[in-house]
Amino acid sequence: MTRFRFRLPAAAATATVAGLLIAAPAFAHIHADPAEVQGGTEATVGFTVEHGCKTSPTTELEIQMPDGFTAIKGIDVAGFTATVKGQVVTFAGGTLPDGTEQAFQVSFTAPDEPGEVPVKIIQTCEEGSTNWIEVQADGQAEPEHPAPVLTIT
C-alpha cells in the first residue's frame, strides 16, 4: 500500500512536466505587450520575437497594423530601423540571433471600437521566413503560427 502512495504523486509530477514540455512551443510565438489597450487612445505596444526561423537569425520584421489604427510609428531598436508605409511598420537593417528575445515597439492611436484584433506579422530570417498571420477560430486549437492579438477596451 505504501508503494502506491508514492507512485501516484510521482506519476502526477511526470504528467505535469510532460504537459509543460508539450506546451513549451506555445511560448515561442510572437506576443504583444501590453496585449490590451484602451480604444481611442495613444498606445505603445511591443511585439516580442523570441527566436529566429528554424535557428536562422531574424533580419526583418513586418508588422501589419489593422485598419482603424492611426498615427502609426515604429521605434528603432537594437540595430533595426523602423519605417512606416500605410498600415505597415517594417523593422530592417539588423540581425537578431536565434534564441534572443527582442521587443519591436509600435506606437499608434487605437480604434474606438472594442474587440479583439489580430496583428499579422511577417518574420524574415537569413534563411527562410515565418508568417505569423493565422487567426484562431472560436473553439478551435491554436494554429501553428498565430497572429498576436490586441484587445481594444
Annotate each predicted stretch with a short phrase.
Residues 2-12:
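Bacterial N-terminal signal peptides that target proteins for export
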Residues 2-4, 33, 37-39, 126-153:
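Extracytoplasmic/periplasmic copper-protein system
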Residues 35-73:
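Low-complexity, serine/threonine/proline/glycine-rich extracellular segments that form mucin-like
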Residues 40-45, 102-103, 116-119:
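Short, solvent-exposed loop/turn segments enriched in Ser/Thr/Gly
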Residues 64-88, 136-139, 148-152:
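A surface/secretory-pathway sequence property marking extracellular, secreted
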Residues 84-99:
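Extracellular adhesion/glycan-binding regions together with long Ser/Thr-
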Residues 96-115:
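Low-complexity, intrinsically disordered segments enriched in Ser/Thr together with acidic residues
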